[in-house]
C-alpha cells in the first residue's frame, strides 16, 4: 500500500427524527467554552430553495468562528430539507481552511427549485462579517433574560399581524420596521435596546437605523424564529 497521513476527523454527523433533520460539523459552543477558546456565534434562518417556488422549507444554521482570524470552528443545522447540503458545504470549508471571509463568495448551482440566489451559507458569511467589522452587535437567546433584567428594553420590529402569530413573553416596545424612522421620537436615547424581528434581517436593518440615530442597540441573534424553537415556553400566541 501507499503510506498516506490521516489528517483526522472533524466530527461531521447527521440524524433524522420523523420529518426533521439535524446535522453538525466541527466544534460545538460547549466544547469551545470548555477549552476557553475565543469565539463568536451567528444564526441564520432561510429556505432550502427560493421561497417563491413551491415546497420551500425552513433551514436554520448556526456558525461558530474565531472573531479575529475568521477561522470556522463548527456549524450546526436543523430543518426539514436541505440541512445535509449546507453542513456538507461547511464541513468542506473547515477542511479546506476557508474562513468567514470566504463564505459570501462561495458559488453554488442556482435555479428556484434547488436553491436561492444567496444561499443560507452565503448569508452566514455576511452576518458573520457584520459582527467582525463592527456593523452589528448581537446577543444570544440564552442571554436575553439577563440583559432585560439589567435594564435593557426589547424592541420588536415585526408587523402587528406577525405579533398575533407569536411573541416573546417579555415587556415589548413594538414599532414595525417600515415605521421606525418616523417614530424614532418614541424611543429614549438614554435607554439600551435589544431589537428583534422574525429571522434577523429586519432587526439588523433596524439596528443600523438606530445606531446611526445615536441609540445603543444590540440584535437578538436568530430572532423570533430561533427563540421559539429553543425556548417555546417563552413565547405566547394570540392577542
Roles of regions detected by a PLM:
Residues 30-34, 91, 161, 208:
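Surface-exposed charge patches
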Residues 101-112, 116-153, 160-192, 198-239:
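Rhodanese-like catalytic fold shared by cysteine-dependent sulfurtransferases
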Residues 81-100:
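A short, polar/charged loop-to-alpha-helix boundary motif
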Residues 1-79, 116, 120-146:
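Mid-to-C-terminal Rossmann-like scaffold of FAD/NAD(P)H-dependent oxidoreductases
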Residues 21, 79-80, 96, 199-200:
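Short beta->alpha junction loops/turns
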Residues 25-26, 86, 203:
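Generic non-transmembrane alpha-helix signal with a bias for helix starts/N-cap capping motifs
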Residues 42-43, 154-157:
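Short, conserved beta-strand edge motifs with alternating hydrophobic and charged residues
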Residues 1-4, 37, 95-99, 108:
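Generic secondary-structure signature for well-ordered alpha-helical cores
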Amino acid at each position: 500500500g501507499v503510506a498516506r497521513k490521516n489528517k483526522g476527523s472533524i466530527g461531521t454527523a447527521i440524524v433524522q427524527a420523523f420529518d426533521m433533520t439535524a446535522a453538525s460539523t466541527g466544534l460545538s459552543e460547549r466544547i469551545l467554552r470548555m477549552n476557553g477558546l475565543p469565539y463568536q456565534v451567528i444564526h441564520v434562518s432561510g429556505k432550502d430553495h427560493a421561497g417563491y417556488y413551491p415546497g420551500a422549507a425552513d433551514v436554520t444554521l448556526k456558525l461558530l468562528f474565531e472573531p479575529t482570524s475568521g477561522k470556522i470552528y463548527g456549524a450546526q443545522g436543523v430543518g426539514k430539507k436541505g440541512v445535509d447540503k449546507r453542513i456538507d458545504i461547511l464541513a468542506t470549508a473547515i477542511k479546506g481552511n476557508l474562513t468567514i471571509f470566504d463564505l459570501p463568495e462561495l458559488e453554488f448551482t442556482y435555479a428556484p427549485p434547488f436553491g436561492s440566489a444567496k444561499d443560507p451559507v452565503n448569508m452566514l458569511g455576511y452576518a458573520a462579517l457584520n459582527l467582525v467589522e463592527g456593523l452589528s452587535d448581537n446577543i444570544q437567546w440564552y442571554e436575553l433574560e439577563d440583559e432585560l433584567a439589567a435594564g435593557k428594553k426589547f424592541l420588536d420590529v415585526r408587523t402587528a399581524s406577525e405579533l398575533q402569530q407569536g411573541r416573546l413573553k417579555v415587556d415589548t416596545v413594538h414599532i414595525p420596521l417600515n415605521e421606525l424612522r418616523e417614530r424614532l421620537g418614541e424611543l429614549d436615547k438614554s435607554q439600551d435596546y435589544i431589537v428583534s424581528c422574525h429571522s434577523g434581517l429586519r432587526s439588523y436593518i433596524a439596528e443600523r437605523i438606530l445606531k446611526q440615530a445615536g441609540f445603543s442597540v444590540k440584535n437578538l441573534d436568530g430572532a423570533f424564529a430561533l427563540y421559539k424553537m429553543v425556548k417555546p415556553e417563552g413565547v405566547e400566541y394570540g392577542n
